[in-house]
Swiss-Prot record:
InterPro entries noted in UniProt: Pept_tRNA_hydro (IPR001328), Pept_tRNA_hydro_CS (IPR018171), Pept_tRNA_hydro_sf (IPR036416)
Reported function: Hydrolyzes ribosome-free peptidyl-tRNAs (with 1 or more amino acids incorporated), which drop off the ribosome during protein synthesis, or as a result of ribosome stalling. Catalyzes the release of premature peptidyl moieties from peptidyl-tRNA molecules trapped in stalled 50S ribosomal subunits, and thus maintains levels of free tRNAs and 50S ribosomes.
Self-association and partners: Monomer.
Record's protein name: Peptidyl-tRNA hydrolase
GO cellular component: cytoplasm
Taxonomic path: Bacteria, Bacillati, Mycoplasmatota, Mycoplasmoidales, Metamycoplasmataceae
UniProt keyword annotation of Cytoplasm present: yes
Site, Discriminates between blocked and unblocked aminoacyl-tRNA: residue positions: N9
GN (gene name): pth
Localization per Swiss-Prot or TrEMBL: Cytoplasm
Catalytic activity: an N-acyl-L-alpha-aminoacyl-tRNA + H2O = an N-acyl-L-amino acid + a tRNA + H(+)
Keyword Hydrolase in record: yes
């Protein structure tokens, strides 16, 4: 069973902010597959079937690892079957990349997951949000209309790539999607 986790912050004040791109990706998958996150456990919400779990932590970003670790332990999911989607300030807006492993790159959500799981060997799909002058204000800020239109388009491909990860090896998905975002 695969586990896809979109990172973000809970609450309406954070909806459609740059830091919630992971939540937006999960929402896009739900829309494409006509499913909803109807289960609640371990301070998060998720959809589950025999092939995959699609999830959002309801903790704040820097506590995402607690939810991910609890879900993985409860459903006996190995780290090899986890993929995390989140924002990346080092990528230009409208760009995305799939990686098999890596450091946190300063992102507190993936940093907490790496610490809780005690490994950097976590598959991830990073979505570019660009960089602003003040990092905290920038990531917690909402997209401009022009940037939102770019993000809305890329989320389609991001959702397709994540769904492809459920049924295909990550190297196949990387070859197919990296460079096409």
């Amino acid at each position: 069973m695969k586990l896809i986790v979109g990172l973000g912050n809970p609450g309406t004040e954070y909806e459609k902010t740059r830091h919630n791109i992971g939540f937006m990706a999960v929402d896009k998958i739900c829309e494409k597959l006509n499913i909803s996150l109807n289960e609640k456990k371990f301070n998060g919400i998720f959809y589950r079937n025999k092939d995959f779990i699609l999830a959002k932590p309801l903790t704040y970003m820097n506590k995402s690892g607690d939810f991910v670790q609890a879900l993985m332990q409860y459903y006996d999911i190995s780290v090899e079957d986890l993929i995390v989607v989140y924002d990346d300030m080092d990528l230009l807006i409208g760009k995305a990349v799939i990686r098999q492993k890596g450091s946190s790159g300063g992102h507190n959500g993936i940093k907490d997951i790496i610490e809780k799981l005690k490994t950097e060997n976590i598959k991830r799909l990073k979505v570019g949000i660009g960089r602003g002058d003040n990092a905290i204000n920038f990531v917690l800020g909402k997209f401009s209309i022009a940037d939102y239109q770019i993000i809305d388009k890329i989320l389609d491909g991001v959702a397709d790539a994540l769904v492809s990860c459920i049924y295909n090896d990550v190297r196949f998905v990387m070859n197919k999607f990296n460079g096409s975002f």
